[in-house]
Every structure is written in C-alpha cells, then in structure tokens.
Amino acid sequence: MKGLVVILSILSSFLTNLETKTLQSDFTITISEEVNAPMNFPGKILIQGDKFCLEMMDIKAAYNGKTMYMYTSQTDELTLTNPTEQELLEANPFRYAKALVDVCNITEKASQDGKQTIITLTPKDQSIGINRFVLQVRNEDLMPMKAEIKEGKKISSLKMKEPKYVSGEQQFEIVPEKSTFVNDMRL
C-alpha cells in the first residue's frame, strides 16, 4: 500500500502524460447493470489532453478543444456542437480522474500480478453523480490499462488493448465528404 502522496504523484504524472503526449489504443467498453447482461463495444481512441478521436461501431466522435464532431455512417450525418462538460466526461472517461482528484477519497492497491496500480476515487459528496471511478495504470510507464465508472447500478468499464503514445501532429476533427449532411448546432 502506497501513501497518499505517492498515489497523488502517480495520478499527477498520469494526467501530465495525457496532457503532453498523444495516447492511441484499441479498447472494449463494457456496460453492465444489475438486471441486464453486460454489453461489449469495441473501438479505437486517440487522446491528447482534452482533445480526442473515438470510433465505435458506426459512430465517430472527435473534439478539438472547442467543437465536438459526431459522425454517424448509417445516416451519413455529421453533427457539430459545443459540448457540455458532462458530454465530454462521457466521451473521455479519463477526464474523471482530472475532475475528481480534489473532491474524492483516494485509495490504491496493486494488481494481482503486481505490475499495475489500481487507484480508486470515491466522491466525498455523492451528489457528484458517480459512486466510484477506478483507474488502473501500468507501473513501468503509467500507461492507462483500464478505467471503470460506477453510477448507481450501472458500471461502465473501458479496457485498453495495447495502448501506446504516438508522435507527430494528430487531427482531432472529422472532415465531411461532399455527400455528408452537416448539422451545425454550435451556438
């Protein structure tokens, strides 16, 4: 068991890496509730700071720090919005670590193999909307391996598959084809 100062240092280093580097990974999101069987959704993600690109099934989403792009291939429609903080949290679960670090009780434990650290953030005030945020990082490089959010009876789990940091300039927007219907809902 590490002390609180060490845990906060790990979280700080992890968040600094996400701000200064570009993380790329395939992933699987698992949504489970007490009543229903778990649902799994594979996808790909690219994250740098608050910016991200996300692909899941027939949906692509991107955020460039100002505009949210949401493309649905089934309807060939691109929607542009100014997202709310809640929408950004739902699209990029690592934002929870940043948003909750100052308002949570923080605990830590080692994974079974000892190669990863599991950090649990439990809000001191349950009016925040979530019951628990769990972040699992690889010890050698603080690479995120898993994030889990518990909201009431629902658990959303994001499991990374071979995450890595990539170099070079990345595009965090979706450029529509000429035939794509663009729905600009920005204020």
Per-segment meaning from a language model:
Residues 1-39, 46-51, 176-187:
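N-terminal leader/targeting segments and the immediate start of mature chains
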Residues 7-24, 38, 67-131, 186:
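Flexible, processing/modification-adjacent segments and terminal tails
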Residues 27-29, 53-57, 118-125, 146-150:
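Short beta-strand segments that buttress and anchor functional surface loops
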Residues 38-42, 56-57, 64-65, 128-133, ...:
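Short, surface-exposed coil-to-beta transition loops
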Residues 43, 52, 59, 104, ...:
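Residue-level detector of beta-strand structural context in well-folded domains
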Residues 44-91, 151-156:
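An acidic-aromatic
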Residues 46-48, 109-111, 136-140:
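Short beta-strand micro-motifs enriched in acidic
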Residues 113, 124-131, 139-187:
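Non-transmembrane domains of secretory- and envelope-associated proteins
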